[in-house]
Regions:
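Glycine-rich N-terminal segment of FAD-binding domains in flavoprotein oxidoreductases
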Residues: 1-73
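Conserved glycine-rich FAD pyrophosphate-binding loop
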Residues: 15-16, 32-36, 61, 68-80, ...
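Short, surface-exposed beta-edge/turn micro-motifs
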Residues: 28, 46, 97, 135, ...
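Short conserved micro-motifs on helix faces and helix-strand junctions that flank
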Residues: 51, 131, 178-179
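FAD-binding subdomain of flavoenzyme oxidoreductases
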Residues: 57, 66-158, 186
């Protein structure tokens, strides 16, 4: 799948196509997004990058590092794709998502969110779909806010609770806990 129109056609013509994650045990036809990769747009001065779902973390990091920037969430396996990280993550990643492009079950191409930090367009579908395992729609593109590398490097990644938890969220949680619960009463 190298184009949106190919993906839309495949979804429209599918009878046994079921959107699944690689963790599902099924005989249904899987939709492999790995060939649909690359940077759609990158605005280093705005701290925003839009990536196709099949783009590997490694490939995205190479682009970001050229401008001394990094994702604000932690990913242990750099071979995973942006789409798979999006589909299997939780709220840690959703804090970084600005917008998405999806194909719904009818084959319609839909855009949600945008490329700005503040979005007041109603329901935040882009964040709702984080962790949905790709079962609600085919995620084709994702826009992320990124941070300067020096900000991310100052965070203590050893304290990150899960593979995909945001180091920034972890650091903020740790500091808030020290202020609001200095004696460790609440677990």
């Amino acid at each position: 799948m190298n184009s949106i129109s190919e993906l839309q056609k495949k979804i429209r013509n599918a009878s046994q196509l079921r959107i699944t994650s690689s963790a599902d045990d099924t005989d249904d036809q899987l939709l492999n997004m790995s060939s649909y990769s690359g940077v759609v747009e990158y605005f280093p001065e705005e701290l925003v990058i839009t990536l196709k779902a099949g783009t590997s973390i490694k490939e995205a990091r190479v682009v970001l590092e050229k401008n001394s920037q990094a994702f604000s969430f932690y990913v242990n396996d750099s071979e995973k794709t942006i789409g798979s990280i999006f589909a299997t993550s939780g709220s840690e990643l959703s804090d970084s998502v600005l917008g998405i492009q999806i194909i719904n079950g009818k084959g319609d191409l839909l855009n949600f969110g945008g490329q700005v930090m503040k979005n007041v367009a109603g329901y935040d579908v882009s964040r709702l779909l984080v962790g949905s395992l790709g079962k609600l729609a085919v995620i084709t593109q994702i826009s992320f806010k990124v941070l300067p590398e020096q900000v991310v490097n100052r965070l203590d990644l050893k304290e990150v609770k899960s593979r995909t938890e945001s180091p920034i969220k972890s650091e903020i949680d740790k500091k808030l806990k020290s202020v609001f619960d200095p004696y460790g009463v609440f677990i």
